[in-house]
Regions:
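Residues in the short beta-alpha loop(s) of Rossmann-like NAD(P)-binding domains
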Residues: 47-48, 108, 132
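C-terminal hydrophobic helical "lid"/dimerization subdomain
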Residues: 90, 134, 138-184
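Mid-domain Rossmann-like dinucleotide-binding core that forms the NAD(H)/NADP(H) cofactor-binding site
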Residues: 1-68
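Predominant activation on well-ordered alpha-helical scaffold segments within soluble catalytic domains
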Residues: 2-6, 31, 35, 77, ...
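Glycine-rich cofactor phosphate-binding loops and adjacent beta1-alpha1 units
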Residues: 10-14, 52-125
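Rossmann-fold dehydrogenase core element
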Residues: 101, 113-153
Length: 184
């Protein structure tokens, strides 16, 4: 997703204002990688207060609750929607600047209305990606092994028997984890 997006950016990543919508596993990985690739002005919006604190600690970037502090109109050059809901797509289109790039990754729901007029008149590039190549997977595993994503303290491990409670905790915002791994 990032390689495809960066080819479409008008300016180098380090000059861009970047917004990642969602601080789950996809959003956290994206933010960590964006920081590693040189993104200086980076914000992650996340509704879970505990995750926001984790994002600030592990990524070293600004975070915001989109419910109380939605992204400002035309405030970012590059937006990654790692959630994929109707509300986050609206946030992405509100936040993107003319000539900017929106990368849509999350698939939370089907509901969507895209402001085609804004897309056209503001010359916005809208990209989507779903899966990854074997080369992407190998590069990610190598990056994890090399410690490029930090100490992974933002990943929580629980037993398989604790799986149902893990989903409840994630849904209620009771966990700071961007990812919960269930082990047998």
């Amino acid at each position: 997703a990032l390689n495809l997006s960066m080819r479409a950016l008008v300016r180098p990543l380090h000059e861009c204002s970047v917004l990642v919508i969602g601080g789950g596993a996809i959003g956290m990985f994206a933010a960590l990688l964006l920081r590693r690739l040189g993104a200086r002005r980076l914000c992650v919006t996340e509704t879970n207060e505990r995750r926001r604190a984790s994002i600030e600690r592990h990524v070293g970037c600004e975070s915001a609750d989109p419910r109380s502090a939605p992204p400002a109109e035309a405030s970012h050059d590059f937006v990654i929607d790692a959630v994929g809901s109707k509300a986050t797509r609206q946030d992405a289109f509100r936040a993107i600047r003319p000539g900017g790039v929106i990368m849509h990754v999350g698939l939370q729901d089907w509901a969507s209305e895209i402001d085609m007029r804004k897309l056209t008149l503001a010359e916005i590039t809208l990209l989507g990606t779903y899966t990854y190549t074997t080369a992407d997977l190998r590069a990610t595993v190598a990056a994890l092994d090399d410690g490029l994503f930090g100490d992974l303290a933002w990943v929580e491990q629980r037993t398989l028997a604790e799986g149902p409670q893990a989903f409840v905790d994630l849904d209620r915002g009771a966990s700071a984890a961007a990812k919960i791994v269930l082990a047998p």
